[in-house]
């Protein structure tokens, strides 16, 4: 039945209550303790729609029968609060949220839609990791940081709009988002972690922000269908493994701000047939083009440049830039 006067649910209060299928309406609840409903695997109906509660860590972890949640008035969600809720399909709203714990919805593999997210400045680490069906999520324009692996292996995510309030995208944030078609990083972003878009194999075009001065390691590795990459304006080096496994990339022009091409930067770019290397480049790692088809690859170089000398020494076909 309903629980009209209940205000507080203790830590582990219903933990492993394997026969619990319904928790009645509790409109006055303000706090749900840590592990309160952990592994209530038959719990389908939760009478907390619209309540202004704080939800503790792992409060609903592995509640594998929940399908929809309205968290529109919830202000705080703890770490792993809803992780491993494998049948959860919809989170109607997170519009009042001011504190969201890391891994909060990790491995909610049926989760398709997340409603409006409140005015967070940071999206926590691994918050939607392995949400393999996630297709609809909108980030607020207060967002400044997208945390480590926040969307890692969200295989179904077809697009993401990164607000121009974001300045930092941490490592692996979108790694393995295999349905993303185009990736445009706003110019507000000045810091990006390694492998940030690695394995986004369906993306055909990737645009990095103008003011980034470096390329993160393995940044777009295994973006199998990428045919166009737009460099930052002041980038100084092509980092380790950055284009590794970009097997559809045919031509690329390296900006004249670049001085270094690092370890295996273009490893296994097997379709690469033409690369323009400016006179600004003064160092190319001996492994930078490992796995490329040397007999089909033409370097476009400046007469007397380091790139020309390197091409001659290593038996690459080269022509002079016009």
Which residues are covered by each model-predicted region?
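Consensus positions within tandem repeat domains that build extended binding/scaffold surfaces
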Residues: 10-15, 33-38, 56-59, 78-81, ...
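Structural signature of tandem-repeat unit edges
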Residues: 1-8, 18-31, 41-54, 64-76, ...
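Short, structured coil segments at secondary-structure junctions
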Residues: 313-315
